[in-house]
Amino acid sequence: HICVVTSLEHPLSHKEYLTIEDIKNEPLIILSKKQGEEYYHDYMESFRLDGMIPYIKKEVDDLNEYMMAISLGEGIGLTATEVINENDQVVAIPLKESHHHADYAVGYHRDNEKKAIQQFMKYVEDYFRL
C-alpha cells in the first residue's frame, strides 16, 4: 500500500488519508534513478497517469537519506508503508485514488520442499493479500 510520508509537524500529517489533489503543490523528496531505472520510470509514469506534474525538490540516493529529508521537513514523499520504520520520525498517510503502487516479488527454487519455505510463502501471500 502506498502512503504519503510527512514530517511530524507537516500540516497534512493529521489527515486520515490523502489524494493526489491534496499533494499536487507539495515539494517532493524522491529516490533517484540509482535505486533503479525501472522503479524511477514507473514512479514518474504514475504521476503522469494521475494528471500531476510533480514538484521535485530533492532526489536522494538511499532510503535513510530519504526519510531524514522528510523528517526534517524538506518535503513529503510517497512510499510503501512496509518500508517505514517506527524510528523514522515521520507520519504515513494512506494515498487514495492514485496510480502509484508497490510491487513485490519473492523467489525460491521450485524443487525446494522445506516446510519453512512453504510456511514463509504462505505468510507472505497472506500479508500482501490484505
Q: Where on the chain are the PLM-derived regions?
A:
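Short beta-strand-to-loop elements that line the ligand-binding cleft
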Residues: 52-62
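Short amphipathic alpha-helical coupling segments at ligand-binding clamshell hinges
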Residues: 39-42, 112-126
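Secondary-structure junction motif
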Residues: 26-50, 117
